[in-house]
Amino acid sequence: EVGAATGTFNITVIALNDAPTIAINTGVTLTESGSVSITALMLNEGDPDDEAAGLTYTVTSAPVKGQLELTTGSGVAIANFTQDDIDNSRVIYVHDGSESLEDSFVFSLADGGEDEVGAATGTFNITVIALNDVPTLSGAGDTLSFTENGGATAIDGDLSVTDVDDTDLESATITISSGYVSSEDVLGFTDTSSITGSWNASTGVITLSGTDTKANYETALESVTYNNTSENPNTSALTITWVINDGDGNSSSVTSTVSVSAVNDVPILGNAGDVLAFTENDRATVIDQNLSVMDVDDANLELATITISSGYVSSEDLLGFSTQNGISGSWNSGAGVMTLSGSSSKADYETALESVTYDNTAEDPNTIARTITWVINDGTVNSSTVTSTINVIAVNDAPTIAPSAGGTVKESETFVITSLKLQAIDPDDVPAGLIYTVTSAPVKGQLELTTAVGVIITNFTQEDVDNSRVIYVHDGS
C-alpha cells in the first residue's frame, strides 16, 4: 500500500513568427474628384504576434486615377503605410477627377520577420461614382471695336467649348451684363438647323437653345453679333457675359468687351422748296417759312449759309437777316451769300433761317429765276444742300420828264431840241420806246424832224431828241 510516485515533465515551446494575413479587404467607394479614408473596416491584417505599427503595406502597383496620401502629408503620394496608419484613419485615396469609374492598387503586407514566409499580397479595389462635369467655355476676352452705323458684327471669334463627360450642349446665354442701353444695343443670331436664338430686349440677353455638338455650339457662339441702332450711341464700354449649359449644369461665365465709337452725324435741313413770287418794289420778303432743322447727335448748330446760287445780280439782289438768339448775319454782296453764325439751338436756327428775307432794289429788275441754296453746319460738318426759288416779277414804271426851261430862238430861225432841253426818264424802257405826243401844238411855228423838213410832227421819241432830230421852226411873226 505504498503511494504512487508523482512528478512534473516540463515542455518548453520555442515561439515562431506568424506571417501576417489579410483579414479584411472590402475596397472603397467615393464620388468623382473626391477623397476617402481607408479604415480598418475596409483593410485589416490578421497577425497574432505583431503590433499594428509593425505591419507595413507596400504599394507594388499604384492607382492610376488618383493617389494614396497621408493626412499628415496632403498632396504627397505614398508607396508605404502601416496598419497603425489605417487604424487611425491617416491613409486616404484622392481621385483625380477623371471620368474612369474604377481604380485599384496592388499591395504586399509584411511584419519584417516572416522567417522566409512570403508576404501577404492583395488588390484594393476603388469604385468611383461619376458626377456631371460642367462644361468649360474659354478663349473669351476679345474686344470688339464697334463704330456707329457699322452694322451687326461678330463679337468674339476665339471661343472654345469643352465638356469631358458630354458630347452635346443644350443651351447658352449671352448677356450684355454691363453698359446695356435697351433702346440701342442688340445681340443677333442666325438660327441653325439645331440651335435657335431668342433675344430679350428688356434684359439684354440672347438665349441659344437646342441639342447640338460642342463644335456646333462653338461655331454658333462665335457667330453671335452686336449692333447699335442709334445715331447718337452711348459710348460706355459694354461687357458681354457668356455661359453654356450641358443640360445638367452651367459653365463658369467668361466675358468679352464691346467698345462703341460715335460718328458725327451731319445735320439735316428739310422742307425747303417754297417758291417766292417777288414783285418789283415789294418790301423785303421772307423766302421760305417751312424749313426744318434736325441733328440726331447735336443740340446746337454753329453756322448756316444762304446763297443766291443761280440768277444772282449783285446790283439788285439782297438777302437780309436780323440778329436773334445769339445768331448774327453777314451779307457778302460780291458772292451773293448770307452767313449766319453763332452757337444756338436747332430750334433757334430754324426760326432764324425762316426769317431770312429777299429784296430787289432795281426799278427794272432782271426777271430770271433765283435759286436759293441753304446749308447748315453743326461745327464739324455741313448738311446736304436744299433749295428754294424766287421768281421776280417786273412792273412797268411810268416815265417822268425832267424839269426844262425851254429854249430860245431868233425870229424866223430854227431851234434844235436836244436832250439837254428835253429829257424823259424811264428805268425800264429804252429811248426809242419813249414817245412824246404833242397835245397842244405851237402857234408861232411848228415842230419838224430833220429827216422830213417842212412836215409838221405831233409825235417823236426820246431817241429823236437824243440824236438832235427834233427842231422848232419859227414862222417869222
Q: Positions of the model-derived regions?
A:
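Extracellular glycosylation-rich, acidic/polar low-complexity regions of adhesion-
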Residues: E1-S477
